Amino acid sequence: RSPDIQMCDKYSLETDTATYFLTVNTVGSNLRYLATANPTAGNVLPAEPYFMRRIEQHYKSQINKGYAAVIGEYVYSASYDIGEGWTSDNIVPCCGLSKVLDNINKYTAGPQNNVTFTVTAVGNALNPRELVCKIQGTQVGGLMPMPYFNLRKDTIRNLPLSILNSPSFIGVNINGNSTLATDRIAVSCFSVTYPATFNFNNEKNFYFELKDNTLGNYLVITNFNSNGVAPILYDYNGGKRILGDISVAGQVRFVLAPSTDTLRKFNLISGDISNSQSVTSLSSKTFVNYANAANQGNYIIISNPILYNNGSGVNNVDLYRQYRSSLAGGSFNAKVYNIDELNDQFGFGIKKHPSALRDFIIYANQQFNPAPKYVFIIGRGLSYLDYTLNQANPLAEQLDMVQTFGWPASDVLLSSLPGTSYPSVPIGRLGAINGTEVGIYLDKMKQYEQVQQSPSQTIEDKAWMKNV
């Protein structure tokens, strides 16, 4: 799928948990933010009167299922499709989506035609319609065709500053203009960019952007919640960490070096202890080296450590590996791969991300010698939609031992190359939720394959095949 059909990337579809890796480099220094001087005492630059502030509104009311084929019912693809992702609730023609953005601190003397509006919205029914967007009651962008399940990602530039007729708030309304009362659309996100003063609304963290300036910048920020502690300005472009000057009451001042970067990104963070997250523990992580031949196999078993014990100390997952390595089981070089390890290495630590499996299988196909012949997943899986909407339930982890791909769920896509829908290596799954179920399956598999491989053609040995 094209990344252009992704709506907004503010919220993850897979999990609400973030993992951070602090790496050790034995041959050099890792990247660090460099403490940088803030020479306000000798400043000769005038204070910047405004910056172009972007206020974003992201919606997380529902997981929109995206493009559907309407054949008596709505049928969806397991691949991530147009319009799939977090959105607002469905919006019907009678009642558009309205949002008031407060505390905008508009700079009234700013450039007169420099307001930008962006919107990402999607149709949610098989009806013709146009997308209609209004700022302070004034339509912007004209009537934008968005029929059926089509997606629109629009940027409307050079709007007049006068459209923001209040210095303190912006009213936005978004709707579809279908004549059918039951029509539906959904909005993923929108934003408004406009000239604003350096009033940071008593926030403890404030992200902002500046354009290039070959002379440098002098910033005088007001109404920032520093609680009497010098805040820290992070310069993302330059990798700098600058301590704010709070010697003047009610102000945080910075002198920034000249820059030719077209767009510079900053984040002002309060240094107050109440604004810090305490890390109570760290766990050591040494990645498994899958380039090592000893860690490669041609029968890949992907499972969850929870299934490695049936409650009596028996690891039926490993017994299954032993069976597949035996003559009766096919004489494979069977290996068990821990889903937690794959999440960390191939899913960038993102729990439940399908890339953990898909990218590992791609890697195995390209690097293992010999290449894998089969992939067998041991452990139940849930579609991302079912897991995400229920991840606060303790049972969700028990029912989602090894993640699958998309909604509706598809293990085949875990084994498919990007942009394809056929497996690069045969793949299957045992949807077990405990080690005992793995043992029961293993016993049945042994019996089945023993009978299957038997050369006997007697009625006594083949009668079971007539039992339906």
Residues of each region from the PLM?
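Cysteine-dependent hydrolase recognition
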Residues: 1-468
